[in-house]
């Protein structure tokens, strides 16, 4: 210890106010009779603490969703195909800021800053050319509104003779997060809620396997929130969306089937596992309060690496950190990872 206090060296305090002991055993706890593992709940049922499905990853492994952020639609299309050949199992398209905010590329300050620019139907035709959309899930964070991207995708698939009802995945909006990030919106929030409701109505009728609300936690995680705050703020946004959709006559079942979450995974291994498990449990209780049936109380979770744990100087270190973050996400029971 070199003269340093035992508690300071051997016990680790986290941002969440939790103190880690140096070692844990089966008898760790206030009482020797405490049980670590839950015995009255199973995966795929109850509050979904232990997972959203009964069989876990035995029937369907977690999705591998490498983000493709090339600026031009043709180059992004080639990258999507390349990633599938390399082992990805999800088409994950990252759009630029202008597209996410509904701004024409000609009027954008920095077109293609973080992803592909999509302005016209021709761009979407190029982006989706040769992609097997009926078999491989599709993922796109659409920014303020999913209606624009949804319409372009549907029109493209129809022109190609594809069955849009077989498309699964998410083309999801998150207008409140965009408002927090940008400080402003190009449309009134009420109009965006109207578009969100229309997206749900259309997909439930025409593409029931496609989700249109994508509530992501990265705006909070990258902004300094701890695990507890990250889950709380993310679910607060989701609750707001539920209430606004109910005002517009959307049934809680349809809302539940339209929601998808994305959480960042950080460096504190056990905290990240606990965060994902707790998130499913908390969300189950929230949906129960809204009167949802048990099958609608689970939440579909996509996980992403926390960027604040990465360095620009050493790729090898980033790979090691990424490995532990992926491991914690998988143990936590995510549906897909980016």
PLM regions: where:
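Catalytic alpha/beta active-site cores
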Residues: 1-266, 271, 293, 297-304, ...
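Extended amphipathic alpha-helical segments enriched in small hydrophobics
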Residues: 272-284
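Short conserved micro-motifs at the rims of enzyme active sites and ligand-binding pockets
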Residues: 76, 273-274, 312-315
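Active-site-adjacent loop and "lid" segments of alpha/beta metabolic enzymes
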Residues: 228, 313-325
């Amino acid at each position: 210890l070199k003269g340093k206090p035992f508690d300071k060296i051997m016990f680790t305090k986290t941002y969440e106010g939790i103190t880690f002991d140096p070692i844990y055993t089966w008898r760790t706890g206030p009482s020797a009779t405490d049980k670590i593992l839950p015995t009255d709940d199973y995966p795929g049922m109850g509050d979904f603490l232990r997972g959203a499905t009964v069989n876990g990853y035995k029937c369907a492994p977690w999705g591998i969703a490498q983000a493709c952020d090339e600026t031009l639609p043709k180059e992004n299309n080639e990258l999507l195909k390349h990633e599938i050949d390399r082992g990805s199992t999800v088409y994950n398209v990252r759009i630029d800021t202008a597209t996410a905010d509904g701004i024409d590329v000609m009027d954008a300050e920095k077109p293609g800053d973080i992803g592909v620019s999509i302005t016209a139907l021709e761009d979407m035709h190029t982006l989706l050319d040769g992609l097997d959309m009926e078999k491989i899930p599709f993922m796109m964070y659409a920014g303020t509104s999913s209606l624009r991207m949804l319409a372009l995708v549907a029109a493209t698939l129809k022109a190609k003779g594809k069955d849009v009802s077989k498309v699964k995945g998410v083309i999801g909006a998150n207008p409140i997060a965009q408002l927090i990030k940008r400080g402003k919106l190009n449309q009134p929030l009420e109009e965006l809620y109207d578009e969100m409701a229309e997206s749900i109505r259309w997909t439930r009728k025409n593409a029931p396997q496609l989700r249109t609300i994508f509530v992501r936690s990265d705006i909070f995680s990258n902004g300094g929130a701890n695990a507890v705050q990250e889950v709380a703020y993310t679910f607060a946004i989701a609750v707001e969306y539920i209430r606004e959709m109910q005002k517009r006559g959307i049934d809680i079942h349809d809302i539940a089937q339209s929601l998808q979450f994305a959480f960042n995974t950080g460096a504190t291994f056990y905290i990240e596992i606990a965060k994902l498990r707790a998130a499913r449990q908390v969300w189950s209780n929230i949906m129960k309060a809204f009167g949802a049936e048990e099958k609608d109380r689970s939440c579909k979770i996509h996980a992403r690496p926390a960027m604040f744990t990465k360095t620009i100087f050493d790729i090898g270190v980033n790979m090691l950190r990424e490995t532990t973050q992926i491991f914690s996400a998988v143990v936590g029971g995510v549906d897909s990872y980016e």
